[in-house]
Amino acid sequence: LNKTETNRVNHSPQQDVGAIYKDLDDVLGETARMLMAVVESEFGKQVNYDDMSAFDLRIACDLNDEEAEVVLKIAHEPNNLLGISPKAGAQSALRQWVEAGHQIVIVTGRPPETRDVSVEWLQLNDLPHHEILLVDKYGRYEVHHCQITTLDELRNRPFSLAVEDAPSMATWLAETAGFTVALLDCPWNRDLVSHPLIR
């Protein structure tokens, strides 16, 4: 990562008690609320946060494929990403884990061109971490891109805990990768099928 990233924590292996996977959007930041604002400004559709019963933006906001693509393109503009509010308690939770000796790995499914602005957002909001991974979670990107981590590479990481909001990703982490998953309570994941590794 950029040497100017002041919130990246120096990793001390002897202190390591397990790496923690921490999703970015809607785990550390209020991304869905920003997306709803974009949907309203572009298409005049008002969607309440608690009514977002699906992770898929097309279903949650009644958008067609083209409209959803427009929303995501606008949402990934630097000014919109930098304007996302951090989740309440996100900073204190990360600090407690770091103080306990955990390595914090921020994992996001954002496109590779958003890496720098994502790092900047973490820095601006004083969110400590050791590493950030841009993962092709949903098969959207060219996996040979030098900044993209594949799911196969991700499953070989030694995470003691993964914190997610996306139901499909939480299921994959538990069933395929065998990680213990803390599923953050969100309207779009409340109907997730139970799994012994998801809590």
PLM features: residue spans?
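Acidic, Mg2+-coordinating phosphoryl-transfer loop and its flanking beta/alpha structural elements
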Residues: 158-199
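Short catalytic/ligand-binding loop motif for oxyanion handling, primarily in non-cytosolic enzymes
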Residues: 29-32, 37, 100, 113-117, ...
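Short, acidic loop-to-helix structural element flanking the phosphoryl-transfer center
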Residues: 76-106, 111-119
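Hydrophobic anchor at the start of a short beta-strand
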Residues: 81, 103-104, 129-130, 160, ...
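Active-site neighborhood of HAD-like aspartate-dependent phosphohydrolases
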Residues: 3-72
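Substrate-recognition "cap/lid" segment bordering the active-site pocket of phosphatases
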Residues: 112-163, 167-174
